[in-house]
Amino acid sequence: MNLAFIPSPSTGVIELGPIPLRGYAFCIIIGVFVAVWFGNKRWVARGGKAGTVADVAVWAVPFGLVGGRLYHVITDYQLYFSDGEDWVDAFKIWEGGLGIWGAIAFGAVGAWIACRRRGIPLPAWADALAPGIAIAQAIGRWGNWFNQELYGKPTDLPWALEISEGPNRVAGTYHPTFLYESLWCIGVALLVIWADRRFKLGHGRAFALYVAGYCAGRGWIEYMRVDEAHHILGLRLNVWTAIVVFILAVVYIVISAKIRPGREEIVEPDRDATPAEKDGSGEDGSGEKGVAKADAAAKDPLTKDEPGKDATAENAGAAGAAEKA
């Protein structure tokens, strides 16, 4: 055995004391918590209320899990509905099998419902969460390592992944596509954070950049995989999906930048207001002083930008005058 190879785990179950937890589920749970935690920090830094990201996630996550599983079952229906297969296995989500495309689409529906209930803009919420989702995917991909699934073509490279003999798999060393995608997602998260700082992305453009960045990587990584998949014109279905979604994301970024340049100012209806905001005091009688102080108190934990920094010159001047008073 080459010690440079990446070994596969002997079991896909993590023992948490008396509680057995499948590694796949564990990675997803950790990823969700990291995404919500980091998204909350970005949301608060932009003027939102702490806890809002988690409240919306309560809707988005279940919708996302259902959508991700549906996409997987529909696109790989032969695994569950062919002769000799048990259709009940389609409900065993803990054994692996989530399609990111369905998860994002259905998760967006759940988030939209929650955002409407809270009276906040969905694009702004998505922008705050975007890099956290990429990090969550980077963590979640390690669930494939636990399950010894979705690996690439055979290779003898030093970082090859050792796969043991098992149902529907042949022992050998393969490209660790789970690791490639995990590292790619970390890169996408850093790209979104940098671009958000550099270009003040708003109105859903940070989220669209995450989608485009992920699709660019998923296309070539998907091409390396050897698991069974449907093909269209010689390409795997997920490669075509990545191409189409990538184009849509880029088009959205371009059109959105022309129609709604800059970044929206996030103020939640139920956000804790300062006394100046509540009674409308301030130099211009509209509570600008209270808003300016609240915005100045919150800065993006990574970009160090003030949430109201890209407001109009008129508002900036009014806030400055109020501060001097």
UniProtKB/Swiss-Prot annotation:
Coiled-coil portions: none
Any one GO MF term held by the record is: phosphatidylglycerol-prolipoprotein diacylglyceryl transferase activity
InterPro entries with a match to the protein in the record: Lgt
Q: Which UniProt keywords apply?
A: Cell membrane, Membrane, Transferase, Transmembrane, Transmembrane helix
One GO CC term on file: plasma membrane
Region (Disordered) residue ranges read: 266-325
Q: What is its main location?
A: membrane
Where exactly are the transmembrane stretches of this chain?
Answer: 19-39, 47-67, 93-113, 119-139, 175-195, 207-225, 237-257
Keyword presence, Cytoplasm: no
Composition skew (Low complexity), residue ranges: 313-325
EC number(s) recorded for this UniProt protein: 2.5.1.145
State any GO BP term from the record: lipoprotein biosynthetic process
Q: Name one Pfam family in it.
A: LGT
Membrane disposition: Multi-pass membrane protein
- Entry's family note: Belongs to the Lgt family.
What name does the UniProt record give this protein? Phosphatidylglycerol--prolipoprotein diacylglyceryl transferase
**Organism of origin:** Streptomyces griseus subsp. griseus (strain JCM 4626 / CBS 651.72 / NBRC 13350 / KCC S-0626 / ISP 5235)
